[in-house]
Amino acid sequence: MASFRITGGIALKGDVHPQGAKNEVLQILCAVLLTDETVRITNIPDIVDVNKLIEILGDFGVRVAKNGPGDYSFTADAIDVDFLFGETYKKKGASLRGSVMVVGPMLARFGKGYIPKPGGDKIGRRRLDTHFEVFMKLGAKFVYEEGAHFYGVEAPADGLKGAYILLDEPSVTGTANIVMAAVLT
């Protein structure tokens, strides 16, 4: 059996700066869609999926300012909701599984959220129906374009309504998406 021998007596000094985590920062980045105020986020990891999502947010009309390494400011005061239905969004959104996280904030603030069938990492079973079933419990109508593999939800004219929610499976991403959809009700 392998083992380590640790000889004490030497004090440790210094700082440890942990890198931001991809899955958490994708959720945080999408939350900027909930407000028109400027939001500053630090410790954003320089990872392909994170950079793709920042680019998608910019395509939506979010003003993105890079303040320094891992330090960005976002202002979502001129969102182009019609971007949801364009080919650019369908292509870019399909290449990033985390793009499902734009649905909740867009639904909450603009009354509609859509996503192409997402790609991204093929690790395990990660259902989308959990997200959409709960959006419907908040009063949203589910929309699916079969030929385009395009999913969406639209809020009723009188807006979303709070509801008691119990997910049929554990889902960190689903929970974050649902909280963002419900936060403005």
Each language-model region and where it sits:
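Structural preference for solvent-exposed beta-strand-turn elements
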Residues: 1-185
